[in-house]
């Protein structure tokens, strides 16, 4: 199961992703992301993966697309930090 919520932080929008980003849930996150960037062009977007438990290959690919478009990826768990490190390394950047 996946839960996606949006929080307006003033100058940024936070997309909080909770649960498992896998299988049929990946297109759900993609739709939420694309809707946000269409409705709020020019606003910085932060994807909060603090409560994300698992990401499959399709989810990793989507997060990579999001990162390359300028989205900031945030996480606390070692697992998710490793996922982000792989994504940023592939993009030629440092993990934050």
How should these model regions be labeled?
Residues 1-96:
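STAS-like cytosolic regulatory interaction modules
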């Amino acid at each position: 199961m996946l839960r996606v919520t949006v929080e307006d932080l003033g100058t940024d929008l936070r997309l909080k992703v909770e649960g498992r980003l896998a299988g049929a849930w990946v297109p759900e996150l993609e739709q939420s992301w694309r809707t946000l960037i269409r409705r709020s062009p020019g606003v910085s977007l932060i994807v909060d993966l603090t409560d994300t438990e698992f990401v499959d290959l399709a989810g990793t690919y989507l997060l990579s697309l999001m990162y390359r478009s300028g989205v900031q990826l945030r996480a606390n768990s070692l697992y998710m930090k490793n996922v982000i490190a792989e994504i940023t390394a592939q993009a030629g950047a440092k993990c934050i």
